[in-house]
């Protein structure tokens, strides 16, 4: 069974009449075999009223499956215990995958209410499984005899991961501590849900309304048109609205000549859920941090970070801080140089003010234009969304022989979605890929990959192929122009598509190990390595076509992009690592305490030496990755994986061919297809033939 219990979830009135219950059960699409093409979820049939009954039935069904494993009188072995557990929970996986994906991408009040009921239900059920003494006793019997069972590598790995999940889930705790552990998990499930809901409410709650045309000075036409359309949507015709969605606030901060308005929008962005109102997250953070510490202590770890990292490649907080330090020092040095360049420009222009954090985007863009004669708006017309998407598909075709066919008449959870059939070079089905591109009030911010169906292939049964989703928040079409991406968005598309390939190309027997079920600091390797192809001149010429003329991006412009590729890397590196440090500082606390969140963050950044012109990429109260998300004590993973991805791409460069088939096949076989069937570093060494060093990362960022 997969780690299928995302801790979130619901309020719904359940019909009490037995006949009505029977009717609801019969009509609930989750209980039927999906009949839509390729077995994708029947979004056209699923209604909010179906979720809670389906969750309750799925939990009940899974309980019965666990009881059957426990009641089996045969001697515990791999098949009747470990594999049986992996096979269990099919309905719960199905319901959870749909519900939580929709919760993130297209939520509403009803779904949010449902989530509040389901979160504790799932937490309690998860604990009931992990702390089932009779079940764990059977797992221990199998683990004790593992050397005599002649297990395959994958079977041995599944046994290892299953045993570890029980131990890390509290199975070895005494009865009284188990009850405390369960209560902590239930409380955390609700707090993490509340954090995310608060952040979404704050993000949606702010609008910068502009009613004077002169206040639009400096903004590109596409940005102005999009703001006018947003105002029209909000029944404010003749005005312009800028929001806290990235495609809105980033271009405003980059191009607006109105410094006071840049400051207003920026402060609204970085003060989300820090406004001492009903959506404030400071007390939520306090509770989450202290409950996590208490949970780690119960399991014998001195801090939450020590607990989390024990199951990662990094292993210890010290190793994480050491890596951060190696990149932080040159990154901060470069950031100070960049800040000086911008302050010098302010002085040259007659400015009488000091560079502030809300000035960075504006002046860095001006410096880029001055140094490299490159304006982001100059390249945007060459990055039409559908062409960029096709570029990513072409890279996958050249590397792995994959083909992508857009499907029509497929059930969608939102009209913005596109769906693709992905086939291998021999024509066999690889899987189905959903892509959801644009921001909306019902969608959380950021970009991510999830599964609607995991891949697995049990002995003697058909290979179940995955249904994968890539979700984004890209710039929408504006006026008569299609969706035109900036280069950051181009890299984001390639990044999430890399995650998608990891989920699609997996070839595992067991659901628990398939796809992205790998160490957290390894999971970003397939995504980040894909970003390298996005900027390769050979690839740019495949997809970067002017949306009006069809002209391929000129070599002169490609040269500018490459030359400016390391521009602003001090800022990019430092703001990211500042957030990683903040995450680690919260989660290396070893003593329960009342945390003054603002003071804690200030002290953390001062200790690290962060300059005042830069704030962490995510401040505490909207740090969605680590408080409700799955990256607590793990935001460093992106830089850890960058050590791997920079070294991995070097393997192609060493061959003189970015599409070298020998290297691509090795990466597919040893990384993408393997899922979590092998220890992460072993997978990497099997591909690369050596462990990675940090030098390629520093070189890529221009920090060497």
Q: PLM features: residue spans?
A:
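Sec-dependent signal peptide recognition
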Residues: 2-8
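C-terminal motif of bacterial Sec signal peptides marking the signal peptidase cleavage site
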Residues: 15-16
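C-terminal, non-catalytic "cap/extension" segments appended to globular domains
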Residues: 23-50, 57, 217, 239-240, ...
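N-terminal helix-rich structural modules
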Residues: 23-219
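Short His/Asp/Glu-rich catalytic/ion-coordination signatures at enzyme active sites or charged loops
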Residues: 35-50, 99-118, 141-183, 243-283, ...
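Short, hydrophobic/amphipathic alpha-helical patches that form generic packing surfaces
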Residues: 91-101, 160, 164, 267, ...
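Active-site-proximal, well-structured secondary-structure segments within enzyme catalytic domains
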Residues: 158, 190, 197, 201-243, ...
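Short pre-active-site segment immediately N-terminal to the catalytic Zn-binding motif
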Residues: 475-494
């Amino acid at each position: 069974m997969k780690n299928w219990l995302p801790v979130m979830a619901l309020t719904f009135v359940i019909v009490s009449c037995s006949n009505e219950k029977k009717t609801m059960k019969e009509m609930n699409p989750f209980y039927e075999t999906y009949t839509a093409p390729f077995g994708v979820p029947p979004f056209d049939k699923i209604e909010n009223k179906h979720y809670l009954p389906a969750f309750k039935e799925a939990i009940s069904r899974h309980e019965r499956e666990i009881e059957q494993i426990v009641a089996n009188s045969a001697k515990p072995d791999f098949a009747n215990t470990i594999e049986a557990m992996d096979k269990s929970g099919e309905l719960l996986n199905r319901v959870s995958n749909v519900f939580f994906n929709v919760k993130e991408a297209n939520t509403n009040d009803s779904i949010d209410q449902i989530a509040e009921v389901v979160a504790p239900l799932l937490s309690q059920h998860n604990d009931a499984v992990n702390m089932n003494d009779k079940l764990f006793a059977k797992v221990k019997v199998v683990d004790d005899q593992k050397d005599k069972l002649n297990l395959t590598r994958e079977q041995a790995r599944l046994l290892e991961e299953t045993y570890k999940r029980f131990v890390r889930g509290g199975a070895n705790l005494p009865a009284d501590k188990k009850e405390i552990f369960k209560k902590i998990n239930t409380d955390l499930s609700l707090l993490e849900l509340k954090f995310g809901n608060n952040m979404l409410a704050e993000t949606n709650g702010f609008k910068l309304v502009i009613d004077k045309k002169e206040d639009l000075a400096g903004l590109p036409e596409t940005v102005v048109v999009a703001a006018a359309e947003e105002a029209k949507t909000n029944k404010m015709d003749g005005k312009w609205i800028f929001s806290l969605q990235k495609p809105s606030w980033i271009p405003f901060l980059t191009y607006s000549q109105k410094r006071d308005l840049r400051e207003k929008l920026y402060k609204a962005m970085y003060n989300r859920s820090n406004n001492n109102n009903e959506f404030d997250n400071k007390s939520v953070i306090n509770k989450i941090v202290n409950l996590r510490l208490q949970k780690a202590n119960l399991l014998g770890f001195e801090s939450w970070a020590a607990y989390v990292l024990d199951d990662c490649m990094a292993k210890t907080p010290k190793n994480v801080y050491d890596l951060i330090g190696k990149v932080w020092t040159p990154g901060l040095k470069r950031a100070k140089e960049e800040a000086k360049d911008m302050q010098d420009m302010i002085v040259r222009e007659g400015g009488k003010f000091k560079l502030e954090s809300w000035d960075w985007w504006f002046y860095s863009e001006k410096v880029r234009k001055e140094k490299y004669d490159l304006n982001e708006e100059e390249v945007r017309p060459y990055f039409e969304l559908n062409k960029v998407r096709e570029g990513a598909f072409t890279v996958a075709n050249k590397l792995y022989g994959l083909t992508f066919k857009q499907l029509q008449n497929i059930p969608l959870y939102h009209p913005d979605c596109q769906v693709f059939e992905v086939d291998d070079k021999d024509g066999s089905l690889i899987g189905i890929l959903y892509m959801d591109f644009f921001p909306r009030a019902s969608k959380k911010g950021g970009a991510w990959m999830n599964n609607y169906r995991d891949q697995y292939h049990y002995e003697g049964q058909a290979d179940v192929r995955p249904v994968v989703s890539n979700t984004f928040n890209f710039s929408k079409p504006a006026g008569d122009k299609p969706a035109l991406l900036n280069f950051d968005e181009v890299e984001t598309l390639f990044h999430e598509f890399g995650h998608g390939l990891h989920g699609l190309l997996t070839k595992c027997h067991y659901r628990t190990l398939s796809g992205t079920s790998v160490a957290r600091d390894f999971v970003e390797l397939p995504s980040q390595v894909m970003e390298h192809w996005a900027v390769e001149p050979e690839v740019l010429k495949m997809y970067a076509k002017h949306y009006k003329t069809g002209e391929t991006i000129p070599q002169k412009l490609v040269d500018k992009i490459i030359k400016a590729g390391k521009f602003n890397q001090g800022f990019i590196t430092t703001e990211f690592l500042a957030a990683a440090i903040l995450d680690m500082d919260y989660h290396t606390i070893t003593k329960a305490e009342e945390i003054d969140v603002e003071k804690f963050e200030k002290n953390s950044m001062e200790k690290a030496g962060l300059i005042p012109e830069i704030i962490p990429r995510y401040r505490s109260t909207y740090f969605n990755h680590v408080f409700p998300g799955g990256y607590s004590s793990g935001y460093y993973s992106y830089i850890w994986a960058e050590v791997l991805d920079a070294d991995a791409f070097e393997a192609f460069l060493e061959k003189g061919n970015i599409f070298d088939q020998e290297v691509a096949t090795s990466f597919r076989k040893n990384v993408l297809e393997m899922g979590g069937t092998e220890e992460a570093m072993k997978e990497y060494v099997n591909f690369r033939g050596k462990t990675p060093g940090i030098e390629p990362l520093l070189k890529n960022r221009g920090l060497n």
